Regions:
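Surface-exposed loop/turn motifs in large extracellular/passenger domains
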Residues: 1-34, 40-64, 70-89, 95-117, ...
Length: 218
């Protein structure tokens, strides 16, 4: 059940300590505005925020779940797993406000519901090698990778899933110079997507992107 008022944020292993790497967070109860595995807001020489894991199960309620977030640096190899849960708005493997998102992963399974967006990686610059898997679950919009400058080699796999809006393997929205290349979407096993499906979508250039279907109901 999504609460009407969100509580405080949860950081790192203990809920209060912001760490750039090595967090392993598992929550099966509680009410949080945002849950972050790794987190960093260092402006000068920011470290990479990498190899953090967040798992949400049970009755844990949260508005935002992010494997890792950095205001200024790269986010790499972070993972979020949602199992049997209903969440408020955003699930992101790794997000950055100024740099690159590389090889971050999201798994949504076991009849979970995400009321808004799911993204493997979100970046102001480049989003590369990020993945999303949705298995017997639902979401509004799904992005394998969402980058400002480029999205390359990202993927989305949906099996017995329901998507109320659109699916993007890779998405890039910089007006002046953006590209989406070699991204993939696979829709299979009776899934339903109500909106559009893009292997790759960019303001400027989209090349070698792929969408595959197998046993899709609608």
């Amino acid at each position: 059940v999504v609460p009407s008022a969100w509580a405080a944020n949860y950081y790192g292993n203990d809920g209060v300590t912001k760490v750039p790497t090595g967090a392993n967070v598992t929550l099966n109860s509680g009410n949080y505005d945002a849950v972050y595995g790794g987190y960093d807001d260092t402006e000068v020489s920011p470290p990479e925020v990498f190899k953090n894991n967040v798992t949400i199960t049970g009755t844990a309620a949260t508005n935002i779940v992010c494997g890792a977030y950095s205001f200024y640096g790269n986010v790499r190899e972070n993972t979020v797993t949602i199992s049997g849960n209903t969440l408020g708005n955003v699930v992101c493997g790794g997000g950055t406000g100024a740099a690159d998102a590389i090889k971050n992963h999201v798994i949504i399974k076991a009849n979970s519901v995400v009321n808004a967006n799911v993204a493997g990686g979100v970046a102001v610059k480049n989003s590369e090698g990020n993945t999303v898997m949705i298995i017997k679950s639902s979401a509004a919009n799904v992005y394998g990778g969402n980058g400002g400058t480029s999205s390359k080699g990202n993927s989305v796999e949906i099996s017995e899933g329901t998507i109320s809006n659109s699916v993007y393997g890779g998405y890039a929205d910089n007006d002046n110079n953006s590209s989406a290349e070699k991204n993939n979407v696979t829709i299979s096993a009776g899934s339903k997507v109500s909106g559009s499906i893009y292997g790759g979508c960019a303001i400027q250039n989209a090349n070698e992107n792929k969408v595959s279907f197998s046993n899709v109901a609608e």
